[in-house]
Amino acid sequence: MLGKIVTKIFGSRNERAIRRMRKVVAQINQLEPEFEKLTDDELKAKTDEFRERLKKGEKEEDILPEAFATVREASKRVFGMRHFDVQLIGGMVLNDRCIAEMRTGEGKTLTATLPAYLNALSGKGVHVVTVNDYLAQRDAENNRPLFEFLGLSVGINLPNMAPPAKREAYNADITYGTNNEFGFDYLRDNMAFSPEERVQRKLHYALVDEVDSILIDEARTPLIISGPAEDSSELYIKMNKVIPHLVPQEKEDSDTFQGEGDYSVDEKTRQVNITERGLVKIEGLLAEAGMMKEGESLYSPANIMLMHHVTAALRAHALFTKDVDYIVKDGEVIIVDEHTGRTMQGRRWSDGLHQAVEAKEGVKIQNENQTLASITFQNYFRLYEKLAGMTGTADTEAFEFNSIYRLETIVIPTNRPMVRKDLPDLVYMNEKGKFAAIIEDIRERTKNGQPVLVGTISIEKSEEISQALTKANIHHNVLNAKFHAMEADIIANAGLPSAVTIATNMAGRGTDIVLGGSWQTEVAKLENPTEEQIEEIKAQWQKRHDAVLASGGLHIIGTERHESRRIDNQLRGRAGRQGDEGSSRFYLSMEDSLMRIFASDKVSGMMRKLGMNETEAIEHPWVTKAIANAQRKVENRNFDIRKQLLEYDDVANDQRRAIYTQRNELLDVADVSETIDSIRQDVFTSMIDNYIPPQSLEEMWDIEGLTACLQNDFDLNLPIKEWLDKEPELHEETLRERILEKSIEVYKAKEEIVSAEMMRNFEKGVMLQTLDSLWKEHLAAMDYLRQGIHLRGYAQKDPKQEYKRESFAMFANMLESLKYEVISTLSKVQVRLPEEVEELERRRREEAERLAKQQQLSHEVTKESQMSAVDGQVASGKKVGRNEPCPCGSGKKYKHCHGKLG
């Protein structure tokens, strides 16, 4: 109560922030007449003036009014567009490390030019982050004339660009690109083998467009750079034949299962659980297929890999649906983003799930991947010195932005009052009744010339609605992940009189639907249009625009509520832009996913008791409240998942930072010999400690073990026993010194053969390769630890604390292994004189020719003998990976040594 009184007197936090900024807006407006008098050259010179003032110690906040006035005046001259006062407020919010919530059509792209210009003046670079390549290119090209007029350079960071082009884009004052590409470049830079391979500068200021989509919807998706692991496609195909024999349990209500079944599906958590009956059945089926011995348990350690494949195949069949979660295109399974309805080319599910879906769909199964480097968007964007974002819908997630990213959300007032009518939800008993009502509503509205946008939550639903409209003879356009290329065209025409457009969630996001259609699109279709033609097109557009406004503006129909209120608000926000007329309504049924899984069973019970049929709808505040509560439940659960993911990833993040810092320091120095000497001393000290405990009696020494270890791990053949027999005065300390001296002596002898410079390069290469190899193994080990750590809860232990403790111990072990392996590899390397290398190369060529002849002969004999000849070439033991060290001991990768011969 007291809080409400205080808010009434002093205004909310948001209102107070806006009031404070309006004072600065007044200063900018006062500067306008003065800046209008400046010539183009004088206006351009302001950039150098601001840079000088910043160098002399002035802060960005000190020059903000003048900088914003400069951008506004330049925009008027270059684009003929003047920033509104609310856009100036938006620019200030973005400069203050906050999130600006700006409604659709309020000009977010133009607003972004203000803080981008101001923060680029320091010369440290500004990254403008968008959700897809199309928007990155569009915004960069649209704003380039303005920034170049003011003397700033603009770069675009796109996938598949060559490193020099990427470096040039990053060295620009303002760089546009997607969240994925910025994140992947960061990971790639931390896998580089020379400073020249790196493309990014220090991360200074990120301005994130559609910030809710990137920092919240995609927060659970880590960016992973991976390499191929062992091929196990045969196992996925076999498992795919087993799963269809299993029967799911029936669901009694939203939380309980009943009756017999082999597995239960929890749609809330998207998990499948095998029942006792199912376990027995699976074990029997696997034994029949010869994949497991009769009477063995699926949970035994020997079958842990089979259990992994069973779970992946079961999830693929029970939880992932074609045209909802993924599409199959050109023999490939492509993921569909659940939040935007866009396809995510190149993205793959991990833990064998993608391979299981490929087996289910009968397409070619790609190899499983092994993680080489990974980071979540949460941790990547927190690396920037300064972070800000803008979106049309952030207020519902304000708490999450604040608690995870320390970003306050400020709602920016609209330039004109919003007059869109948001009509109450209508709830039907089933989908059939809902679809009939939607079609009737569309028919009525298009009769009056009103354009309609129908929002669906999946490709499958958009196609169902499309079929129903085709049956009803209603002309319409479909915009979903399958028709990606036509997106801009369809959106440009969605505001035409009587146009009907069906769109999955937020396909076409970032493009405004203009009432009456887009006259610019019509002009673009003409070759060299005359002024008269342009004026004629504008006049026709004005007539259409006025007709659409008179019919009620754009009408939005939601066919289902999304799990998040924010996504529903985004759909509504497509109508009523810039004070235009518009309306929206959601049509729901008790068969919708959200209603079925989360909404109270009481609602459907109440509808049945009222004796409602499928054509009747219920419209009541209770129902709206039940739906809002259901959405709140899901939002809270998703927030908890993201928060928990971050808490676990923070542990890995500390280790990642330590490794990447060490790696970058290593890249930047030319000579690592001092580090190698220091590591050698540590390694030999701890290794000798294992065989000669410090301050121990000679009888406790394991001389045989020490000699063998030096020979096997460091290629040192030292007569330690002889030394001790001949020199009784040789005590522990002097023995340690002698072993170390001998190892240095042998190493220096190698260095004299090949030159110090070559040895320094080799040392650096070995350190980097060993670090990368062990980090890759460490990431896999951390992943396994993470998957099973929740079970510690049953032992009354805190899983998070256990994860921190164990991962730290693993990290410490990894660093010790790094030292040991580096010294071992450097000690074992065989150094050859040039003439010896030529002789070895001659022998290798002869061996390759002999094998080639042998293969040629094997093709000429029968199939059976051919098989035996091939079998004769297969070495026994573990298959050597292409990127592993060659077993011959050369120190080269297998693919560059004996792997070439096959």
Swiss-Prot record:
Induction: Repressed under conditions of excess protein secretion capacity and derepressed when protein secretion becomes limiting. This is regulated by SecM. It is a peripheral membrane protein. One of its GO terms (molecular function) is protein-exporting ATPase activity. It is found in: Cell inner membrane; Cytoplasm. The keyword Translocase applies. GO terms for biological process: intracellular protein transmembrane transport; protein import; protein targeting; protein transport by the Sec complex. It catalyses: ATP + H2O + cellular proteinSide 1 = ADP + phosphate + cellular proteinSide 2. May bind 1 zinc ion per subunit. Transmembrane segments: none annotated. Residues 853-868 have a biased composition (Polar residues). It comes from the Bacteria. ATP binds at residues 87, 105-109, 512. Its cofactor is Zn(2+). SMART domains: SecA_DEAD, SecA_PP_bind. It is an enzyme of class 7 (translocase). One of its GO terms (cellular component) is plasma membrane. Residues 850-902 are annotated as: Disordered. SUPFAM superfamilies: Helical scaffold and wing domains of SecA (SSF81886), P-loop containing nucleoside triphosphate hydrolases (SSF52540), Pre-protein crosslinking domain of SecA (SSF81767). Residues 892-902 have a biased composition (Basic residues). PROSITE patterns: SECA, SECA_MOTOR_DEAD. Zn(2+) binds at residues 886, 888, 897-898. Part of the Sec protein translocase complex. Interacts with the SecYEG preprotein conducting channel. Has a central role in coupling the hydrolysis of ATP to the transfer of proteins into and across the cell membrane, serving both as a receptor for the preprotein-SecB complex and as an ATP-driven molecular motor driving the stepwise translocation of polypeptide chains across the membrane. Belongs to the SecA family. NCBIfam families: PRK12904.1 (NF009538), secA (TIGR00963). Monomer and homodimer. Part of the essential Sec protein translocation apparatus which comprises SecA, SecYEG and auxiliary proteins SecDF-YajC and YidC. This is Protein translocase subunit SecA.
